[in-house]
Each structure stands twice: as structure tokens, then as C-alpha cells.
């Protein structure tokens, strides 16, 4: 795959200063410009800009070379989607979400492997005489990289064609009538586009080292403000990842994430059509408005009104 990662996102919010303060508390590092933030491995991956309501202004995708840009430009032309070329990038707008996507030549992320957690289990004495590493850590949790974004689209089919047939993403899983999980890297998904009555940014996710850091990171945020809790701790069926959803001052969801199941060229997960019942294997309490609904479905309170 010529595409290899999400490079950065530009996120529009009405309260830039508040969301920037939250992002620092979340563990992102201030970068060279005000309201720009970096991850440990991905460099600068978040820019926060003013907007009337929360939205994803731009999504950056990394590719290898000029030939890749040429192929993507031709594919977008076949779809009837205009793009703007620059020396080392091209930009096009997804018709379903209105998000500007900038495909740019950039270095691949090389991540230092996280330390593998050692567990005691029935019949397995992995760490005799020692406490679990996760309970001894004192340092704050810092995201390793941007994991994925989830977008609401008023034309999910058009958005799916844009990312798959235009940009060259691969599909990992689908929820018929609702969503497609698509990847531009070895992660299970980097972009999820779901059908919605309006275009919006549902959430961003940020990778951490292990499930202890999912819990530690979320717990630290909730100690400062319990109302930030949205959904977690849990584990998704799709992607196999542990998660904890939080909400920022723009009422947008952010997710602390342990890495997804992986797709490799020679060892790919089977693509599945999955249903709502398989969203999570186990999960803590859920706040209203987190879970998407298939086209044509209604909540119980909708039917009673």
C-alpha cells in the first residue's frame, strides 16, 4: 500500500483555548505553533483552529512518492472529484463529509516497540514475586500517535468511494447501511465513515502502549472532571482494541486507544460485515449519543414522541 499513515488533523472548534488546554491535559505535547500538538512517535498531529461548530477541517494522509500522487490524482479524476496539486501533495474534498483531505509525501512512522506486559494467569506465573508494572508507573500517559478519525457523512456511499477508489484506502470491515472501516496503514482502520443526517466529526482516537495506560490516562482525565466520561473501559469487537471514550470542551469525543488488530500483507484479518450487536465485547457505562444508528432506525424515545 502506497499510503502509510495519518499525518495530522486540523480540527475546528468554537472554543480553541479550552480545547487546547484539554489537549495538553490529555497528554499531547505543545508543538512549535500555538494550538498545535504532537504525539510521541507521530510528531505534530493536531492543529486546533476556530470554527462555528466542531468539525474536521482537514485530514492529512502520508504517502511515499510523486508516482503515488499521480495515481491518486488520476483515480480522483475518474470519480469526477477535483483535486489541487502542489509539489509534494494534493488536496481534495470528500463530497459526503466536506472534509478536505491532503495526501502528502512524508516519512513513515517507525515506532519503538512498547514493553510487552507480563501477566500472571491460571497455570502461568509470569512475574513471580513482583507487582504489575502498570500499577507502579508514575509518569503521565502520552499518546504514541493518532489512531483514527470517525466522520458522519450525509452520503456514506460517496464518501466510501472517495476514500477507497479515489485515495486508495483499503476496507477492513463494514456495517451494512451504516459504516465502513477503512485503513491507510497496518492498523485495522484509520478512517471510519458512518451515515449521518449532517456531516460532523464524531471522534478522534489516540494510541497508547497498553490497557493499563488506557485506564490510567482516562482515570487521570476523570479525576479532573468526571463529566468527561462517555464510554469505557471496554473492548471493541471490530478492531479488537481496548478503549475509553472521553469528551472534550467542544462536546466532541476523544478516545484513549490500545492498538487495533493489524492488517499485514501476508497476514490480513478477514473482512466482515458486522452488526450493531458486535460493537463491543465488554464495556462499562455508556453516555447517550455515542453509538451510531443504521439508516432508517429510530431510538425508543423517537418512537414514543
Regions found by a protein language model. Give the residues of each.
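N-terminal beta-strand motif that seeds the catalytic metal site of vicinal oxygen chelate
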Residues: 1-17, 56-61, 117-157, 188, ...
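Structured core of small recognition/catalytic domains
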Residues: 157-235, 241-244, 248-250, 254-256, ...
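Vicinal oxygen chelate
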Residues: 6-14, 51-75, 77-142, 145-154, 180, 225-305, ...
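The feature marks the first
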Residues: 4-34, 38-71, 77-79, 295-304
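Core segments of cupin and vicinal oxygen chelate
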Residues: 1-45, 95, 151-189, 194
Amino acid at each position: 500500500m502506497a499510503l502509510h499513515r495519518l499525518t495530522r488533523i486540523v480540527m475546528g472548534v468554537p472554543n480553541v483555548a479550552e480545547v487546547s488546554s484539554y489537549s495538553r491535559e490529555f497528554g499531547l505535547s505543545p508543538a512549535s505553533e500555538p494550538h498545535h500538538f504532537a504525539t510521541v512517535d507521530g510528531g505534530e498531529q493536531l492543529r486546533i483552529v476556530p470554527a462555528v461548530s466542531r468539525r474536521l477541517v482537514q485530514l492529512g494522509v502520508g504517502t511515499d512518492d510523486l508516482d503515488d500522487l499521480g495515481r491518486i490524482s488520476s483515480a480522483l479524476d475518474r470519480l469526477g472529484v477535483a483535486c489541487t496539486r502542489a509539489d509534494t501533495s494534493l488536496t481534495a474534498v470528500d463530497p459526503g463529509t466536506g472534509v478536505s483531505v491532503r495526501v502528502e509525501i512524508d516519512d513513515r512512522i517507525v515506532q519503538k516497540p512498547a514493553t510487552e506486559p507480563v501477566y500472571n494467569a491460571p497455570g502461568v506465573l509470569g512475574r513471580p514475586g513482583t507487582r504489575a508494572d502498570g500499577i507502579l508507573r508514575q509518569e503521565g500517559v502520552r499518546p504514541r500517535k493518532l489512531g483514527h478519525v470517525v466522520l458522519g457523512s450525509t452520503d456514506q456511499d460517496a464518501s466510501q468511494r472517495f476514500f477507497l477508489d479515489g485515495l486508495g484506502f483499503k476496507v477492513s470491515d463494514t456495517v451494512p447501511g451504516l459504516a465502513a472501516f477503512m485503513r491507510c496503514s497496518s492498523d485495522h482502520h484509520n478512517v471510519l465513515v458512518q451515515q449521518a443526517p449532517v456531516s460532523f466529526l464524531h471522534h478522534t482516537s489516540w494510541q497508547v502502549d497498553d490497557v493499563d495506560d488506557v485506564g490510567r490516562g482516562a482515570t487521570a482525565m476523570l479525576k479532573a472532571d468526571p463529566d468527561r466520561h462517555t464510554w469505557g473501559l471496554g473492548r471493541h469487537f471490530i478492531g479488537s482494541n481496548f478503549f475509553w471514550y472521553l469528551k472534550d470542551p467542544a462536546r466532541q469525543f476523544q478516545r484513549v486507544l490500545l492498538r487495533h488488530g493489524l492488517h499485514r500483507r501476508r497476514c490480513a484479518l478477514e473482512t466482515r460485515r458486522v452488526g450493531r450487536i458486535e460493537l463491543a465485547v465488554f464495556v462499562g457505562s455508556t453516555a447517550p449519543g455515542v453509538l451510531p444508528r443504521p439508516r432508517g432506525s429510530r431510538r425508543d424515545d423517537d418512537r414514543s414522541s
